[in-house]
Amino acid sequence: MKSKGTRFERDLLVELWKAGFAAIRVAGSGVSPFPCPDIVAGNGRTYLAIEVKMRKELPLYLSADEVEQLVTFARGFGAEAYVALKLPRKKWRFFPVQMLERTEKNFKIDESVYPLGLEIAEVAGKFFQERFGEKV
């Protein structure tokens, strides 16, 4: 499973670069004693701390600690905290942590939250810029 997760992180890196972000994987992000996202990306206007997840189906559950560490890193780095989720045969969807649904002890992305996720172009701001004629 670890190699599959790494492959998805690398796939997302390619998509981020195509969308105009400089992006890197954070090696050992899951085992660091410090808060560490899976990917850090930026395009000069927007900076992202991303926790990468892939699932065969919904819901996706995230521990409160995992979300808290992502938010802690993002605040310290000056980035926006996102969870990027990949489902089979679907595009990457990005969820700002504020969009995650709170459960009794944790967080989740389920069928009601998933359609609200952002596409990579929306996160990059291209949708807004193209709409108003600004070149990207």
From Swiss-Prot:
Residue sites binding Mg(2+) per the record: 9, 38, 51
Active site per the UniProt annotation: 29
Record's keyword annotation contains Ribonucleoprotein: no
Keywords per UniProt: DNA damage, DNA recombination, DNA repair, DNA-binding, Endonuclease, Hydrolase, Magnesium, Metal-binding, Nuclease
Subunit text: Homodimer.
Binding note for cofactor: Binds 1 Mg(2+) ion per subunit.
Protein name: Crossover junction endodeoxyribonuclease Hjc
Site residues, Transition state stabilizer: 53
Family note: Belongs to the Holliday junction resolvase Hjc family.
Naturally occurring in which organism (per UniProt): Archaeoglobus fulgidus (strain ATCC 49558 / DSM 4304 / JCM 9628 / NBRC 100126 / VC-16)
Function: A structure-specific endonuclease that resolves Holliday junction (HJ) intermediates during genetic recombination. Cleaves 4-way DNA junctions introducing paired nicks in opposing strands, leaving a 5'-terminal phosphate and a 3'-terminal hydroxyl group that are subsequently ligated to produce recombinant products.
Domain of life: Archaea
GO molecular function: crossover junction DNA endonuclease activity; DNA binding; magnesium ion binding
Gene name for this UniProt entry: hjc
Required cofactor names: Mg(2+)
Documented EC number(s): 3.1.21.10
Classification via Pfam families: Hjc
